[in-house]
Amino acid sequence: MPGGVYGHQNGAALGDGHPRFLARAERARIWDVDGNEYVDWMCAYGPMLLGYGHPAVEAAVAEQLASGDCLPLPGPRMVELAERLVSLTPRADFAVFGKNGADATSWAVDVARAHTGRPLIVRARGAYHAARPWSLPGLPGVPAHYREELLEFAWNDLDELRALFTGHGERIAVVITTPFDHVTGAGPAPGFFEGLRALCDTHGAVFAMDDVRAGFRFHLGGSGEHFGAAPDLICYSKAIANGHALAAGLGREPLRRAAERVYFTGSFFFASGAFAAALATLDVLEQTDAIARIQRTGRALTDGLAEQARGHGVPLLPVGQPAMPVIRFADDPERRRIRRWCSLVTEGGAYAHPAHNWFVSAAHTDEDVARTLEATERAFKTVATEG
């Protein structure tokens, strides 16, 4: 394999304390190939929401697989899930399905371009929306014209966004954002999403919400409902099926014709096992306090980290959203100190990432938080001593 290990977050680039391969997982714990156990605060980079191997989800998948999975035509589970998502999401009238977050966000860009007849994409500076050329135009192998089709503004800066519309409004197809800042986790400033919505309406552009990472950790109807956003298109993946491969794109009625015109397909898009997993996941979310529990656990974790950092004089920056905290230190531009700290935390039994937001799940317990805070306390003490 190129580089030995590949992926959007190469494990080989992490600190010495991090494992390179994992053998199994259960609830909120993971075990590496050497048998070491960790509390997992990455949740498979987001897809794990209810716990690894959740019995209700896995039972639904097993029942579906007994009847068939990837077939030449879709099954009834696809229709059931589309109807369910539309019923749960106040600003959605239709749904389509893919496999990865990039499927959903790229579909949204295509729909917006088809609807408006325009080429330009606007996003917040530093945001990541897909491992696709339109989102990562500066990477090797990507033609230069992709860079010319992407405009950026600073998160929460309506003046800069307004200036982009003033200069390029007739060519802007879509503004795509996450529900909070991708880099810092900072939430929207008062009036930000209302202003963004008004600019899109004034200039005839589409507002797409990339809810791939955050979806279902804040609100059953989409993170926009929690943060006060009113998008035209919504993109889900990761947690929607508790670890089974699925993505969804939801849209408002005025964009239905454009959605009918774009070409959106894939070899495994009809696989019904993932639809069954998503339906079961939504059942659990509706029937329990899972989302509220995620928020409570995230606050307990991040409050504990903040108290420890203060006690040891380590300058912990604001973590953003407790359910998806961004752990960073001030005066650490090359991330050396945070990498050292995360390696120590991981060695202590809690899997911690130095360059990606963490994720909290409904499976994390008070015991998991306590075990983690024991590891982080020791790590803070060490990095404070090392300076």
Task: Give each language-model segment a name.
Residues 1-387:
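Conserved N-terminal phosphate-binding loop of PLP-dependent enzymes in the Aspartate aminotransferase
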